[in-house]
């Protein structure tokens, strides 16, 4: 069979128009290949994905790499299939890019199976509805917004409040304890962070159970808009073909939307609210619906979601909210108090914070903690204007306990040891529940609040209080 070739008629940034012979138009999402000498010396090194049929035998495509160096009239080859990602155990311990090529200079992947990156979500009858919580070892998460196995979790936060550190701690804790395979998608984030993560994983021994897929900030929007789908294809293979429970980490899902917005404008679509693409909800839905649990295996996904200007009503984070089972909201106000992880205990939610799933005791203590923190928040205006002395004795007690709870929700992280000098702590769920139950019941009312800051279990807080008293 002769190969189907076309020629470039127009190049505008990351968008390339290609003309084919009559009756030979490639299908939407098909990958085309062209040689771009500006990238490297190899043949057909640039992949273009068909996005639109323009009429007059032309297609509009999105480039997955730099288009500098392309010329009008250049020959373009239709591969006759979608962009495919290498799947299977050979991808573990490797870093690949959006088109499935290794970028870690460790030679070819040598896999024998590939999956297309665009696929349908599993049908309803194949999906699993079983609900169970899994422990992360992070107190604030396990107590107030527990994560569901096979669920979707969003970490929301503005710039610099600790989303990537939290996601790295979750990889460290869950991947170590979970023992299964993980897939990490670096979507439009800093290359330095990607490098840090790779080094960290290598040192902790998690790397051989993780596949890394990177499309960083410096890549064209086409690559950033598709890299999450490449990672998802790898995770789907482990779930569907090998029947495993997989962890999928995406940092950052906002960059997926941002890249879609750039591409949408280049494709000539009229922008929607706040300049986002009109297809925002559809694109997010197509990605999120594929991240699900089936009767065969599960994908538990943790997604960092950047919140532009700390505005949770922005269309990008607001669209992601609808798909999530648990949300962990990071707050700048809490970060300013020096409390890390800077999780907002009143804004974070979980579908499984339900006595039927987590048990009566856990539920009751979580609600008591939220009540005390909410009461403290309500009293803050009075304290700011009139001072603590004007409060009733009961309110003074609530404020004292709330401040202890607030500090006890902080925790030293394993991945932050190099910055803080404090050894990381993994806290079992039973210890978390016991600790907060003791604070709420007033057992530790006599201890100073700084004893509860940056410790693991309640025993460590008591020990720290004894050391403080001895000074």
Curated annotation (Swiss-Prot):
| Chain sites annotated for binding ATP | 157-164
Keyword Cell membrane carried by entry: yes
Q: How does it sit in the membrane?
A: Peripheral membrane protein
Location in the cell reads: Cell inner membrane
A single Gene Ontology MF term assigned here is: ATP hydrolysis activity
Question: What does the record give as EC number?
Answer: 7.1.2.2
Pfam families the UniProt entry points to: ATP-synt_ab (PF00006), ATP-synt_ab_N (PF02874), ATP-synt_VA_C (PF22919)
Q: Name one GO cellular component term.
A: plasma membrane
Query: Which keywords does UniProt give here?
Result: ATP synthesis, ATP-binding, Cell inner membrane, Cell membrane, CF(1), Hydrogen ion transport, Ion transport, Membrane, Nucleotide-binding, Translocase, Transport
Q: Which reaction does it catalyse?
A: ATP + H2O + 4 H(+)(in) = ADP + phosphate + 5 H(+)(out)
Q: What class of enzyme is it?
A: translocase
**Alphabetized PROSITE patterns for the sequence:** ATPASE_ALPHA_BETA
Which HAMAP family does this chain map to? ATP_synth_beta_bact
Q: What does this protein do?
A: Produces ATP from ADP in the presence of a proton gradient across the membrane. The catalytic sites are hosted primarily by the beta subunits.
Q: How does it assemble?
A: F-type ATPases have 2 components, CF(1) - the catalytic core - and CF(0) - the membrane proton channel. CF(1) has five subunits: alpha(3), beta(3), gamma(1), delta(1), epsilon(1). CF(0) has three main subunits: a(1), b(2) and c(9-12). The alpha and beta chains form an alternating ring which encloses part of the gamma chain. CF(1) is attached to CF(0) by a central stalk formed by the gamma and epsilon chains, while a peripheral stalk is formed by the delta and b chains.
Q: Which PANTHER family match?
A: ATP SYNTHASE, ATP SYNTHASE SUBUNIT BETA, MITOCHONDRIAL
The record's similarity note reads: Belongs to the ATPase alpha/beta chains family.
Protein's name in the database: ATP synthase subunit beta 1
Organism encoding this protein: Pelobacter propionicus (strain DSM 2379 / NBRC 103807 / OttBd1)
Ranked from the top, the taxonomy reads:
Bacteria, Pseudomonadati, Thermodesulfobacteriota, Desulfuromonadia, Desulfuromonadales
Q: Supply the gene name.
A: atpD1
């Amino acid at each position: 069979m002769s190969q189907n070739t076309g020629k470039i008629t127009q190049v505008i940034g990351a968008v390339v128009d290609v003309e084919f012979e009559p009756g030979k138009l490639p299908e939407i999402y098909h990958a085309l290949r062209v040689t771009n000498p500006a990238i490297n010396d190899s043949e057909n090194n640039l992949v273009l994905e068909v996005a639109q049929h323009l009429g007059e035998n032309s297609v509009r495509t999105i480039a997955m790499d730099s288009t500098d160096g392309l010329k009008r009239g250049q020959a373009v080859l239709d591969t006759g299939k979608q962009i495919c990602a290498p799947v299977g155990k050979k991808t573990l311990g490797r870093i690949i890019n959006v088109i499935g090529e290794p970028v870690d200079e460790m030679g070819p992947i040598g896999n024998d199976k590939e999956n297309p990156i665009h696929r349908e979500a599993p049908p309803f009858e194949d999906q699993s509805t079983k609900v169970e919580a899994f422990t992360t070892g992070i107190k604030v998460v396990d107590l107030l917004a527990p994560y569901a196995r096979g669920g979707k979790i969003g970490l929301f936060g503005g710039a610099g409040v600790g989303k990537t550190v939290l996601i790295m701690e979750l990889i460290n804790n869950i991947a170590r304890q979970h023992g299964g395979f993980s897939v990490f998608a670096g979507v439009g984030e800093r290359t330095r962070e990607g490098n840090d993560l790779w080094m960290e994983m290598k040192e902790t021994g998690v790397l051989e159970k993780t596949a890394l897929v990177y499309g960083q900030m410096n890549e064209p929007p086409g690559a950033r808009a598709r890299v999450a789908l490449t990672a998802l294809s790898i995770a789907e293979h482990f779930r569907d073909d090998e029947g495993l429970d997989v962890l999928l980490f995406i940092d950052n899902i906002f960059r997926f939307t941002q890249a879609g917005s750039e591409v949408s404008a280049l494709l000539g679509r009229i922008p929607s609210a706040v300049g986002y693409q009109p297809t925002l909800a559809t694109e997010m839905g197509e990605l999120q619906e594929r991240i699900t649990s089936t009767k065969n295996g599960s994908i538990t996904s943790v997604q960092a979601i950047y919140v532009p200007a700390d505005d949770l009503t922005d269309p990008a984070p607001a669209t992601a909210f609808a798909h999530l089972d648990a949300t962990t909201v990071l707050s700048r106000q809490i970060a300013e108090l020096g409390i890390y992880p800077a999780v907002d205990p009143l804004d974070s939610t979980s579908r499984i914070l339900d006595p039927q799933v987590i048990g009566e005791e856990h539920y009751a203590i979580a609600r008591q903690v939220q009540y005390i923190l909410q009461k403290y928040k309500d009293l803050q205006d009075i304290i700011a204007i009139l001072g603590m002395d004007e409060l009733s004795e009961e309110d003074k007690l609530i404020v004292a306990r709330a401040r202890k709870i607030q500090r006890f929700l902080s925790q030293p992280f394993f991945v932050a040891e190099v910055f803080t000098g404090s050894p990381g702590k993994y806290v079992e769920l039973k210890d978390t529940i016991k600790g907060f139950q003791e604070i709420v019941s007033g057992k530790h009312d006599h201890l100073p609040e700084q004893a509860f800051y940056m410790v693991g279990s309640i025993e460590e807080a008591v020990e720290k209080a004894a050391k403080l008293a001895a000074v």
